[in-house]
């Protein structure tokens, strides 16, 4: 049966079928919670004689357990003729420990009419546990014709057993469709089909939650979970899982999870197993003894609707490769199509133990092997074959005008034993690569009867891999060699014709590709040299034709830059020698090292923040002798732009300072600080540094008149401001401030494809500031502020970065670098003193132009080759606007509390500063 691509019509049609088929002449029998039955040693029999067309309708949850009908030789629900329907009405039906005797098929349900149908629909929970639990009995649900599980929520079959077929379900036509919650088959056992056996079609479709078959067993037979003599269709489900199912009977057990073979001697068409459009499909750790650790079938079609995985399945066939994951029976065929997800074969093996994904028995073949754009079919386990054919296989063929340009991958990278058999795949067919990519990696070998390519397709070979034609010619029109494999192999890729007098032709240019970009970071590329990358080996008496150009195009990349040139040597076998002419080096962004000079910006921010703390202390309510203890934090962020990569500097620490007002005109203070910083470039580098800082402040207070008298050398000159609002002879405050900081850096660079690198070096930072301000009383009792203090400063900051080098083989050397900045902050501060004179707050606005600046930069070079490049720091604008605010509280005569915050804004950069502290007078 084939289903609509839309789930609704399918579920709706089955619902209508259920209603109309049972409503014409049916008797509705209500099952209430009072009908629940729990047998004991005195009363263990419970059997319903079902009449044709009966409908059992639940009005509440019903539980039936501990039933033994052995003496009656009947199922719990025995149907001799006609159909039966169980309608859940969103209630639960539970069966536990049901027995019907060893000669009766179906302990819970036996429907014996070859034209009838048994249906279960609309249940909130449908549970069958150990019904029966004895392998000598004959399964849980049996229908001689059709059996359907439709539109239920939770469905559970656990530990049901049968000595014949289908431990959970046995029927001629089994349908599990449209269920809304999980459907699970766990630890069921039978001879054929540990969970389900169908002598005709088996459909599992449009289920909206997990379909799980786990630890089911085929004892003395095949199909650990499913066995069918008819078609198996598993389509459009949300998630299908087959895990740890097994068929391990010696000389019999095939298909650890699924087995589908035609009835011996039958003239009916060969049944097909179809997996289509399932959002996720997983076969994991299923086991068989005679082939097909997961699936054994004559005809198999898998079309992915999402990730499709065959993982760690095993076929225990001694001394034979009979399909660790899949075995295709004699004369059979297999189609694999990655439509909406990648299909992966990994860790599947035989008992020898050799990796083995798919095995083709005699005359079996691939019908389709194709992947849509963006998806792939990945064989980390080889394909083996007993066939010796020459039928045509068009990889990524396009029979229905669909675009198949994805990747078919054969790789030996998952082999742990490094046995040659883990790497060799055989497809005994004439293969044409119609479109997309055929990729052979990590030592894998692929043998076909004949190989050709259509224009626009790509054959990609690693070094050390082989493409072999066992019977016919090889004609290649689009060849690429993956030079990322230079790091793992020095053996040339081989293209070989095994049969005498056969030809190998290579036309169009040969590409050298590096998908990861790491090939040009290989240290061997630092020198010009020749690499033998390709060997063409025709059969005895055969010939090689090469029309590829001598110069190979090089796509833009990072790492060592240069050109490739190709030359061929040899007469019979030809070896392609690729000459690499190295020119220079271009570092990838994460290797440029921009964080190193950027740290100088962080040093400057930290030193300036200490200077600002001392300036703030000088405006204290109590300027006499005291000790300040402050906590300080800086948050400097440069956002990404056309000129910058992102940079962040966060630091925090403490400040200890002492101050003293020597005279009313002379004030001085000294400070010590320790800061802990984290810097990052948002790429691969992070730095931590510890910075020790010291600073000294001297402040001198005079008046405007004194300045003019001194300048004019006339003590009788009187100068002031002509305004009622201001003092006629305002004060002038001048200060000198210097600071020094020493930082020890520890940087980690965590590359995506290379080991982590650690570096250490030291930075130093000096700063000098001279400035003046003029306090003016603007409002005696202003609501917002009372005083205005215009100020102007001249500030010099110089930061120096020491040189250092990395100790790794491909390490970098960084030269010293520096930052120099001369700025002139201009602004005004407004102050407000509370009536109690215990609280003072101020806020200020300033503009800071950098009148001279030398941005930080340094030179980086590869130690091993000497190739160098300039490493610039982030470009920070020369113009900044700063807003700040400070609050002070005179707690008592000996203690003052302070909190200050500021924000400095530049285009693409922000700096936030906060400090809180307390002064103790002594």
UniProtKB/Swiss-Prot annotation:
Q: Where in the cell is it found?
A: Secreted, Cell wall; Cell outer membrane
One GO cellular component assignment for this chain's record is: extracellular region
**Mind telling me which InterPro entries this protein's record contains?**
Autotransporte_beta (IPR005546), Autotransporte_beta_dom_sf (IPR036709), Polymorphic_membr_middle (IPR011427), POMP_repeat (IPR003368)
Matching PROSITE patterns, A to Z? AUTOTRANSPORTER (PS51208)
Superkingdom in the source lineage: Bacteria
Gene3D superfamilies, from UniProt?
Answer: Autotransporter beta-domain (2.40.128.130)
Protein keywords: Cell outer membrane, Cell wall, Membrane, Secreted, Signal, Transmembrane, Transmembrane beta strand
Q: Answer whether the UniProt record assigns the keyword Mitochondrion to this protein.
A: no
Leader sequence segment: 1-26
- The Autotransporter domain covers 620-922
Topology in membrane: Peripheral membrane protein
The family assignment reads: Belongs to the PMP outer membrane protein family.
The identity of this protein, by name, is Probable outer membrane protein pmp1
Instruction: Please name the source species.
Output: Chlamydia pneumoniae (Chlamydophila pneumoniae)
